Amino acid sequence: MTNSENFIGAMSSMYNTLAANRAYLDSLNVFPVPDSDTGTNLCRTVKGGADAVRRMEQLGVTDLLEKSAKAMLRSARGNSGVIISALFKGFSDHMSRLGAFTPSELSAAFDSALKSACRVIGRPIFKGTVLSIVIACRNELSKSKFSTTKEAFSILAPAAEEALRQTRFDLEETRNAGVVDSGAAGLTLMIGAVDSFLSRKGEPKSLQKGEQILFKKHAPLPASEYTYCTEFIVLRKNKMSEEELEKRLSGVGGSVIVVGDGEIIKVHLHTNDPGKAMELSSPFGALTDIKIDNMALQAEQNRR
């Protein structure tokens, strides 16, 4: 298979693996709020990236990366989905600057992904979250010897799993519930899916009962202080920065994530006043793809 075919296949494998584990990832979701939608949101996010590059074998890997990253920004859903899209954007930006997808640059690409996510998260938490998986992957690659992407992901998969185990103890929410972080679990599954695909290990991995030392169903936790998970896309009409928009929105909610490219800005936040959040964002451009979920209602449904 060509490098481009491998990339397209790896994207599909990531989506298939998430889809196979969607319900279980949903059940792990306790941070930042227990709204049980991490698996669902990651599936929608990654499906956008996989669909965008399907049957695009004529493109080079860096072009495919850029295309999938842009699509994932548009399809991103939820806190975890928007963060994953920011990680992909940072990864893609690094490889695009090089002009080629180079295995020796994978550690630096993970570092670029980490920086991209940190720029768009108002208050990044490095321990016990998806970011801890990125850090572990970056660090492991920086001290390992490999010459191919296949070899790199055979190193990354166990490193991510080891880092995932630790997330059970790093956050109060996951400690109390006895689970690993759902977003971190999602990224770990994605990395494992790429490893399985490149190594031709067979079908995407599903979480089985024997693995519940890592993944244990929890009792739902108290709901967030904010009622609404609010998301929308801003169609840029000027050069106002994402940083300025993030600053405005941080006054009306929490879990604020603002990430953009040259055409759009994707906004995610938890708030009690979605209308105010949209009002503050409207000077940056027209709003589209508006989505508002009542997290208090979701949390109550999870208690039943």
Spans of features found by a protein language model:
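N-terminal loops that bind phosphate or other acidic moieties
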Residues: 1-304
